[in-house]
């Protein structure tokens, strides 16, 4: 029987209708966060898709030292708290160090471990101590079966509810490729699997001082992943991605999200028909 992670009234499982994890890459301010959350809550309510809001208070692994990192943990968590209380939606955000975990867990329902940090034992242990759901993004350098070691660490530290995320694998320099077998392989670990459709089209460092991306392939990869069968779809969105402070080339345009989600619901239903 496939593992199901429960979060409030949301059930996250590989055999269940997919959950949407979405929001802007980084927190840009209170007004922008509330604007985005309102749009996303209305859309997901209309389409009857379970929704978890995602945005980062710090982009600690920017390509360049001059890249905009975000509003910081104190201001960021305050903004996420306002989003959570105003729209009654669960929150997921990244943690980059052990010291951030307890404070972040006061607001976030899910702690996300970035792909570059997925093997950091001390960080995994600190996240585990919060008692929250821990969502780990598979490193671009890891085979999907190597996530068994991450699972063992988390379970050893007492984590009951784990989510794994596929976000592409290194394919030469400045490029990623999505191996859809990874979704099935990680699901065999009895962990709900999420597909990150926007970071999978990244071209890391591809613009020299920043990361490039091929937004035009987001929908294609999202359809492929949904056809395999996933617990969640992770897509970062922005009303004006070309002018976003980070990951603009990868993020979906907010105006295009509805049409894509309608298609993904159809793929998801067919894939999971008994």
Swiss-Prot record:
Top-level taxon of the source organism: Bacteria
Catalysed reactions listed for this entry: D-arabinose 5-phosphate + phosphoenolpyruvate + H2O = 3-deoxy-alpha-D-manno-2-octulosonate-8-phosphate + phosphate
Pfam families referenced in this protein's UniProt entry, alphabetically: DAHP_synth_1 (PF00793)
Keyword tags: Cytoplasm, Lipopolysaccharide biosynthesis, Transferase
Pathway the protein acts in: Carbohydrate biosynthesis; 3-deoxy-D-manno-octulosonate biosynthesis; 3-deoxy-D-manno-octulosonate from D-ribulose 5-phosphate: step 2/3; Bacterial outer membrane biogenesis; lipopolysaccharide biosynthesis
The keyword Cell wall biogenesis/degradation is assigned to this record: no
Positions of transmembrane segments: none
Transferase among keywords: yes
E.C. no: 2.5.1.55
InterPro entries found in the cross-reference section: Aldolase_TIM, DAHP1/KDSA, KDO8P_synthase
Chief localisation class: cytoplasm
GO biological process, one term: keto-3-deoxy-D-manno-octulosonic acid biosynthetic process
An annotated Gene Ontology molecular function: 3-deoxy-8-phosphooctulonate synthase activity
Gene Ontology annotations for the cellular component aspect, listed alphabetically: cytoplasm
Enzyme class: transferase
Compartments reported by the entry: Cytoplasm
Family the entry assigns: Belongs to the KdsA family.
Protein name from the UniProt record: 2-dehydro-3-deoxyphosphooctonate aldolase
Gene name in the database record: kdsA
């Amino acid at each position: 029987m496939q593992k199901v992670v429960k979060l409030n009234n949301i059930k996250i499982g590989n055999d269940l209708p997919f959950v949407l994890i979405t929001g802007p890459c980084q927190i840009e301010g209170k007004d922008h966060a509330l604007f985005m959350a309102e749009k996303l809550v209305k859309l997901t309510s209309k389409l009857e898709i379970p929704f978890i809001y995602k945005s980062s208070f710090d982009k600690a692994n920017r390509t360049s030292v001059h890249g905009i990192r975000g509003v910081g943990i104190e201001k960021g968590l305050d903004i996420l708290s306002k989003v959570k209380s105003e729209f009654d939606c669960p929150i997921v955000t990244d943690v980059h160090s052990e010291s951030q975990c307890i404070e972040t867990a006061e607001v976030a329902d899910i702690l996300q471990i970035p792909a570059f940090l997925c093997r950091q034992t001390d960080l995994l242990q600190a996240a585990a101590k919060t008692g929250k759901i821990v969502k780990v993004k598979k490193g671009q350098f890891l085979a999907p079966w190597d996530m068994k070691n991450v699972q063992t660490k988390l379970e050893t530290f007492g984590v009951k509810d784990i989510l794994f995320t596929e976000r592409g694998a290194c394919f030469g320099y400045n490029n990623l490729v999505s191996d859809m077998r990874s979704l099935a392989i990680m699901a065999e670990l009895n962990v709900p699997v999420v597909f990150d459709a926007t970071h999978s089209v990244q071209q890391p460092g591809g613009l020299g001082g920043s990361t490039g991306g091929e937004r035009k392939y987001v929908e294609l990869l999202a359809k492929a992943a949904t056809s395999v069968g996933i617990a969640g779809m992770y897509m970062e969105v922005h009303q004006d991605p070309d002018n976003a402070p980070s990951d603009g080339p990868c993020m979906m345009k907010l105006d295009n999200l509805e049409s894509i989600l309608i298609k993904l619901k159809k793929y998801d239903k067919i894939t999971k028909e008994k």
